[in-house]
Regions:
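Structural signature of beta-strand start/N-cap positions in the alpha/beta core
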Residues: 90-92, 114, 121
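A short beta-strand-turn-helix
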Residues: 43-61, 102
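Structural micro-motif
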Residues: 102, 108-117, 132-135
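N-terminal targeting signals for export/organelle localization
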Residues: 1-41
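Typically the conserved alpha-helix immediately C-terminal to a functionally engaged Cys/Sec
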Residues: 73-88
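Short pre-active-site segment immediately N-terminal to redox-active cysteine/selenocysteine motifs
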Residues: 59-62, 66-70, 112
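Non-catalytic, surface beta->alpha helical segment in thiol-disulfide oxidoreductase systems
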Residues: 5, 120-142
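Hydrophobic beta-strand anchors of alpha/beta hydrolase catalytic cores
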Residues: 63-64, 93, 116
């Protein structure tokens, strides 16, 4: 009889522990997702529809990150671009997904990604293909 009670109590503790662990892990996942969304919200994603307004007609120097969601180097480069956006309010940083805006990729002759293009006064002033350090990226914009 005591063995049955101990087994039942053990099972109850195990189930309660698993429920608590599940809730904890679920909340941790939500925190990680919200941090990703928070940082991603700072950089505007530009499309063919709003490119002229947001980039060509901008009063600021614009840094364009041409990327694709499936591109590994683009994902690795993204935190560098985000850091430049956060630390340099005088630069407008935007992202263009080459899969969604193929016409812009063609217009700006983006053959490899990531490609970074700098626009000043509506005209391309500089470009680089591949990943760069934060300091090189800032230097490129100046």
């Amino acid at each position: 009889m005591k063995n049955k009670i101990l087994i039942i109590v053990g099972i109850v503790f195990f189930v309660v522990g698993m429920i608590i662990l599940s809730i904890y892990l679920n909340n941790m996942n939500k925190v990680e997702i919200s941090k990703e969304e928070e940082s991603a919200m700072e950089i505007m994603k530009v499309t063919s529809t709003n490119f002229e307004e947001e980039v060509l007609n901008s009063d600021k120097t614009v840094l364009i990150d041409f990327y694709a969601d499936w591109c590994g180097p683009c994902k690795a480069y993204s935190p560098v671009v985000e850091a430049v956006a956060e630390e340099n309010e005088d630069i407008k940083v935007v992202k263009v997904n080459v899969d969604d805006a193929q016409d812009l990729a063609i217009k700006y002759q983006v053959m490899s990604i990531p490609t970074t293009v700098v626009i000043k006064n509506g005209q391309e002033s500089n470009r680089a293909v591949g990943m760069m350090s934060k300091s090189d990226l800032i230097e490129m914009v100046k």
